[in-house]
């Protein structure tokens, strides 16, 4: 397919993960809620990146990464919507995304790696400040993933949300550096 696209001047764009978490990883480790899944994903990324390094230079790491918040099974192979599990899985996918960016740039410095979210435009019901704030908070649920992938750090509003909801969250120095170095 790539050869045919290139023959007609079409540059392929590859999405590395599009809702297909292997059931073996779900059964063995609980999928993306376990950080060991990152290494499995990176072996896959390296394999695909090496194989198609002369044919593909446009990549997306995860399709609609933010969908993990409301559809954990589809987006990350998580059979529940427990906030702690979702936060852990999101962290692992975001670290995997950053490591994928680094890996793909090491394979071919010309690679361009991006991200995408599933997003529907949001409007406040009225111009009342409470409606506007609610709309902003809902938008941040989606923007959070872009913020981390593009800026390389967890935004304060998400850390405060975790704190309010009793989610235990931390990043060690190595993880912080990975997020910072692996921006899209």
Regions found by a protein language model. Name each.
Residues 2-184:
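Active-site region of glycoside hydrolase catalytic domains
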């Amino acid at each position: 397919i790539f050869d045919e696209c290139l023959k007609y001047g079409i540059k392929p764009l590859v999405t590395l993960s599009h809702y297909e978490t292997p059931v073996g990883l779900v059964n063995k480790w609980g999928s993306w809620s376990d950080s060991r899944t990152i290494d499995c994903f990176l072996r896959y990324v390296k394999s695909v990146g090496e194989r198609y390094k002369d044919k593909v230079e446009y990549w997306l790491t995860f399709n609609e990464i933010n969908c993990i918040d409301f559809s954990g099974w589809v987006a990350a192979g998580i059979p529940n919507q427990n906030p702690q599990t979702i936060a852990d899985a999101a962290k692992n996918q975001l670290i995997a995304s950053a490591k994928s960016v680094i890996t793909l740039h090491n394979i071919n410095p010309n690679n361009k790696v991006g991200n995408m979210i599933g997003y529907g435009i949001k409007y406040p019901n009225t111009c009342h400040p409470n409606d506007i704030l609610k709309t902003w908070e809902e938008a941040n649920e989606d923007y959070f993933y872009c913020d981390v992938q593009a800026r390389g750090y967890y935004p304060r509003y998400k850390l405060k949300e975790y704190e309010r909801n009793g989610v235990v969250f931390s990043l060690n120095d190595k993880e912080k550096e990975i997020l910072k170095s692996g921006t899209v």
